[in-house]
C-alpha cells in the first residue's frame, strides 16, 4: 500500500495555478466529434482520463495533438462508429461519446461502462434520452448498437427523473445536430454542464437555459471551428482551499472561479478562514 507522509505544523504560502476541470474537458472532447473540423482546447489537465478520451477520439478517426496544456482535435476524418471496449471499461464517462456519434454519423456502438452486463444499469437514463430523440438501441452480446432514423435524430421533450450529469451531457450532445427543438427538463445544473453549453454555443450550437434545470436546444445543421479555455477544476481548488484553512498560511489560487465555489468557500469562512474573491481575474486568496 502506498503511504503519504505529511510533516505538518507549517503554514502554506505562495500561489498555485488550478488545472483545468476534468469533468468539464471530457464532455468537451467528446463534443468535438460533432464538428467536421478543428477544435482547440486550452488549460487541459494532463491526467490519465484525458489521455484515455484522447485515445478514444484517435480510434474513431480524429487527429489529436497536445502542445503543453493545449489540445488540438481535428475531427474531419471521423468514420469509425464503435467505441473501443478497453477504454469504455477503463473510464465510465466515455459512454457520452455515443450521443456525439449518433449526432455526427447517425450510429454508434459501445459496451456498458465498467463492463456492467447485468442488473441495474447506471446508464438507463442515457439510453432513455437517446430513444426519446429517435434512436433505436438494441443489445447483443453485451454490446449496445444505436442507430438514428434515416432522417437523423429529432428534437424531443426529455424529462430526467434524476439530475444525472452524464445523462444530461448525453442528451445535450445528441440534440445539438438533431432536427427541431429539444427541451431537457430535470437537467443537472453543475458548473461543468454550464461550461459544456457555453463551449457548444461557441461552436455554433443554440442552447438556452444554462445554469437552470431546463435546457432548450435548437438543432443546427453544422458547427464551426472554435477555441475554448477550460475553467479551473473546482474540486481541486476546493481541496487546496481546505488545506490552507486547516494548516494556516496565505495562498492565492489562480484560475479558480469563485462563483463555482460559493458553498465550500462559505463553509471555510464559517470555520474562520479569511477569503478574498476576484471574479474578474478568477482568483481566490485564502
Language-model segments: residues:
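Structural preference for solvent-exposed beta-strand-turn elements
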Residues: 1-286
Amino acid at each position: 500500500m502506498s503511504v503519504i507522509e505529511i510533516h505538518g505544523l507549517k503554514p502554506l504560502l505562495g500561489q498555485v495555478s488550478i488545472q483545468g476541470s476534468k469533468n468539464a474537458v471530457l464532455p468537451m472532447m467528446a463534443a468535438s466529434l460533432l464538428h467536421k473540423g478543428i477544435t482547440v482546447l486550452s488549460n487541459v489537465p494532463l491526467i490519465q482520463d484525458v489521455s484515455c478520451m484522447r485515445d478514444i477520439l484517435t480510434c474513431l478517426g480524429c487527429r489529436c495533438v497536445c502542445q503543453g496544456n493545449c489540445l488540438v482535435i481535428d475531427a474531419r476524418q471521423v468514420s469509425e462508429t464503435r467505441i473501443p471496449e478497453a477504454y469504455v471499461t477503463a473510464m465510465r464517462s466515455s459512454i457520452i461519446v455515443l450521443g456525439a456519434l449518433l449526432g455526427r454519423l447517425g450510429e454508434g456502438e459501445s459496451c456498458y461502462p465498467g463492463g456492467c452486463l447485468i442488473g441495474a444499469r447506471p446508464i438507463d437514463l442515457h439510453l432513455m434520452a437517446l430513444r426519446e430523440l429517435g434512436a433505436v438501441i438494441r443489445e447483443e452480446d453485451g454490446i449496445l448498437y444505436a442507430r438514428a432514423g434515416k432522417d437523423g435524430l429529432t428534437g424531443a421533450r426529455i424529462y430526467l427523473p434524476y439530475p444525472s450529469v452524464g445523462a444530461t451531457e448525453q442528451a445535450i450532445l445528441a440534440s445539438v445536430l438533431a432536427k427541431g427543438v429539444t427541451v431537457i427538463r430535470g437537467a443537472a445544473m453543475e458548473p461543468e454542464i454550464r461550461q459544456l453549453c457555453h463551449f457548444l454555443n461557441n461552436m455554433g450550437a443554440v442552447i438556452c437555459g444554462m445554469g437552470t434545470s431546463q435546457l432548450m436546444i435548437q438543432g443546427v445543421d453544422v458547427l464551426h471551428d472554435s477555441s475554448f479555455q477550460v475553467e479551473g477544476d473546482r474540486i481541486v481548488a476546493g481541496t487546496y482551499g481546505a488545506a490552507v484553512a486547516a494548516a494556516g498560511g496565505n495562498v492565492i489560487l489562480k484560475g479558480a472561479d469563485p462563483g463555482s465555489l460559493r458553498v465550500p468557500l462559505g463553509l471555510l469562512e464559517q470555520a474562520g478562514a479569511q477569503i478574498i474573491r476576484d471574479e474578474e481575474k478568477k482568483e481566490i486568496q485564502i
